[in-house]
Structures are given as structure tokens and as C-alpha cells.
């Protein structure tokens, strides 16, 4: 098993606490409202496992995440994708560390690290990561636009 890491920093005019609440704390409710391809997000067991189910006809059927850390004080979350079509037969899991920090005039910089844990001797290709990054940025931009259009939400 190998591990390949990627880092990304994204800036936004949205305050870090608002973005954290939207993308982490209330994502189970907000994401299905903003993204029609997401049917629902359900917590399993004690809530540390979250299953995101996509609508019929979507290229992805479901994703399952294990939540390791949600730190409201430091605006940090850590979780891993542990099941789903995205992993295929080449990935064991993908771990994510996200930190939301104040930046500029009330804005935020979101710092993320993605670690791809591969199966066997598979070597991750940049295009594999780039597809995931593209989808993650799409979600980020949709939530950002919603928060900018609705300044009282999560304020």
C-alpha cells in the first residue's frame, strides 16, 4: 500500500466560521439542498460514519466517510472516504484534513491535505487526483456562492 499526498489552499471572502458550519457542521442538510445530484446524507451508528447517496443515473452511487475530528473551536475537520464507487479497486481510502483560517478582510483560507491510500503497488496518477479536486472545488464554489448570496445564513 502506498500513500500519495496533495495540498491545496483556497481563499474566499466568506468568514471561516460560516464556511466551517456550512461545509462541516451542517453539511448533511445543506449539500442535498444545493446539489441536486445528492439524494441525501445519512449518519450511521454514533454519527461518525456518514453515507452520501446520489440520485439514480448519477455516475456515483454512494460515498461513505468516517469522521475522525470535528473541532469547532479551531475550525478543523479530519475524515476519510472508506467506501464508494470513487475508490474503485485501486484505492483503499482517501483521508482529508481541512483547516479554515481567517484571511484578509473577514474572509477565509481553507487549507486541505488529501492522502490517497492505494491498494497493492498501484501508483496514483495526477489525473485521478485532479478529478477528485475538481469535484471538491465544485462543491466549495456552490457553498461559497450560497453563503455570499445569503449573508445571514450561519452568521
Curated annotation (Swiss-Prot):
Gene3D superfamilies: 3.30.530.20. GO terms for biological process: abscisic acid-activated signaling pathway; defense response. Transmembrane segments: none annotated. One of its GO terms (cellular component) is nucleus. GO terms for molecular function: abscisic acid binding; protein phosphatase inhibitor activity; signaling receptor activity. PANTHER family: OS08G0374000 PROTEIN-RELATED, PATHOGENESIS-RELATED PROTEIN STH-2. This is Pathogenesis-related protein STH-21. It comes from Solanum tuberosum (Potato).
Amino acid at each position: 500500500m502506498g500513500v500519495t499526498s496533495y495540498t491545496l489552499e483556497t481563499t474566499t471572502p466568506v468568514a471561516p466560521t460560516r464556511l466551517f458550519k456550512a461545509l462541516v457542521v451542517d453539511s448533511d442538510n445543506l449539500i442535498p439542498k444545493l446539489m441536486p445530484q445528492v439524494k441525501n446524507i445519512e449518519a450511521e451508528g454514533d454519527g461518525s460514519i456518514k453515507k452520501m447517496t446520489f440520485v439514480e443515473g448519477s455516475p456515483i452511487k454512494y460515498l461513505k466517510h468516517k469522521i475522525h475530528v470535528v473541532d469547532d473551536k479551531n475550525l478543523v475537520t479530519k475524515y476519510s472516504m472508506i467506501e464508494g464507487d470513487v475508490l474503485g479497486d485501486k484505492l483503499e481510502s482517501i483521508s482529508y484534513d481541512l483547516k479554515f483560517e481567517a484571511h484578509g478582510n473577514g474572509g477565509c483560507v481553507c487549507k486541505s491535505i488529501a492522502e490517497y491510500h492505494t491498494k497493492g503497488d498501484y501508483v496514483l496518477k495526477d489525473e485521478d487526483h485532479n478529478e477528485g479536486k475538481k469535484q471538491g472545488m465544485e462543491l466549495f464554489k456552490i457553498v461559497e456562492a450560497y453563503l455570499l448570496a445569503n449573508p445571514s445564513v450561519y452568521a
